[in-house]
A protein has these predicted regions:
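Short coil/turn segments at beta-strand junctions that form active-site/ligand-binding loops
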Residues: 68-70
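C-terminal structured interaction module
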Residues: 72-103
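Hydrophobic, often amphipathic alpha-helical segments used for membrane interaction and targeting
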Residues: 1-66, 85
Length: 103
């Protein structure tokens, strides 16, 4: 299942970029996190690679901005998605997070 998802991404890597540019976070989440649904054997992998890292990076970012200065942060797309993504985690801590488009 995970290999199938990766193969789809490899077949058309531009689709990920296009989806990100268009703000299609639902499509991205389906592509990146779809293998997790109905496959408990992937849960620990996703916990380690994405969700625990998101928590740790959120802690670091919260500390980084305590001085009140604006920051520009770049992260991989998968860390930006869904309710366990870094923007959502920062919002739960009272931060204002906005998506910036290069277009």
């Amino acid at each position: 299942m995970l290999e199938d998802a990766l193969a789809r991404i490899e077949d058309d890597p531009g689709a990920l970029v296009t989806a990100w540019e268009n703000g299609d976070e639902e499509w991205l989440a389906r592509q990146l996190f779809g293998p997790l649904e109905g496959n408990p054997e992937f849960e620990e992998f996703y916990e380690a690679i994405f969700f625990r890292r998101n928590e740790a990076m959120t802690d670091q970012l919260a500390d980084l901005v305590r001085d009140g200065r604006r920051r520009f942060v770049v992260l991989g797309a998968a860390h930006m998605l869904a309710e366990r993504g870094i923007p959502a985690l920062l919002r739960t801590r009272g931060f204002r997070v906005e998506r910036v488009s290069g277009r």
